[in-house]
Design a protein with these regions (language model features):
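Residue-level signal for inorganic ion chemistry
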Residues: 8, 40, 144
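Charged helix-capping and loop-helix junction motifs
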Residues: 22-26, 122-123
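Helical hairpin unit composed of two closely spaced alpha helices linked by a short loop
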Residues: 17-19
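Conserved beta-strand positions in the central sheet of alpha/beta enzyme cores
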Residues: 9-10, 105
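His/Asp/Glu-enriched, well-ordered alpha-helical/loop segment
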Residues: 26-114
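Glycine-enriched alpha-helix->loop->beta-strand junction motifs that scaffold or abut catalytic
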Residues: 2-9, 30-35
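Active-site microenvironment of metallo-dependent hydrolases
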Residues: 81-184
Length: 184
C-alpha cells in the first residue's frame, strides 16, 4: 500500500458504532503508511467532534492490544492534523511559511485542562487527546480568516443555518417515509 501511495482515513468511532471491527492501525503506522483521522458522518457516528475521535483512536487500540504504549497523544494529534492534510493533498495541517493558516485556539483555562502543566508539551497533548472536546475550541481560523471567535461564529448566522438544516432534513424524511394512509 505504501508503494502505491495509498492514504488511509481511520474512522474508529464510526467503525465501532457500525460494528465494522478495529483497523490494524499499529501495523499500518509501522509499515510507514500515512493515516489520518476522520469521523465519517453524523449518521455513522452521531458526532463530528474530532477530539472524541482522537481519544477513541488511542483508547481503542490500547485496550484491544492491552498496550498503553500505542497511539501516544502527540502521534494521534499528528494523525488528526498533518496526516489528514497530507492525505487530502491540502496545504494545511502544520504551521509553516507558505501553508494556509487553518488554526484552532483551544481555551486551556477550560476545566478540561485542569490541572495543567503548560511547560510540559506531552501533558498538553495528553489533555488535547484524552480530556478536551470541541467545546474547548475558542477560536477557529480558516485560511487566515477568523470564522469563530470567543465561541461565536463570525461569518454565518448559526441559528439560521441550524434551522435550515433541520427543515431540509425533514423534507428528505418526508420523501423517504411512506405515509401510514398508504398502507390502507
Amino acid at each position: 500500500m505504501r508503494e502505491t501511495g495509498t492514504q488511509i482515513s481511520h474512522n474508529p468511532s464510526s467503525n465501532a458504532k457500525l460494528g465494522n471491527g478495529i483497523a490494524r492501525l499499529p501495523e499500518m503506522l509501522n509499515a510507514g503508511l500515512n493515516v489520518g483521522l476522520g469521523h465519517d458522518a453524523a449518521e455513522c457516528n452521531n458526532s463530528r467532534d474530532l477530539f472524541q475521535v482522537m481519544k477513541f483512536a488511542s483508547l481503542m487500540h490500547r485496550a484491544s492490544r492491552v498496550d498503553a504504549s500505542l497511539q501516544q497523544a502527540p502521534d494521534v494529534v499528528r494523525m488528526a492534523t498533518r496526516n489528514g492534510s497530507d492525505a487530502l493533498g491540502h496545504n494545511t495541517g502544520r504551521i509553516e511559511t507558505g501553508r494556509k493558516a487553518d488554526v484552532i485556539l483551544v481555551d486551556t483555562k477550560n476545566q478540561m485542562f485542569t490541572p495543567l502543566m503548560p511547560e510540559n508539551s506531552d501533558h498538553l497533548f495528553s489533555h488535547l487527546v484524552f480530556a478536551a472536546n470541541g467545546s474547548c475550541v475558542d477560536t477557529t481560523i480558516i485560511n487566515g480568516k477568523i470564522v469563530m471567535e470567543n465561541r461565536q461564529l463570525t461569518t454565518v448566522d448559526e441559528q439560521k443555518v441550524l434551522e435550515e438544516a433541520n427543515k431540509a432534513f425533514r423534507r428528505v424524511l418526508e420523501r423517504m417515509v411512506v405515509p401510514a394512509s398508504a398502507n390502507t
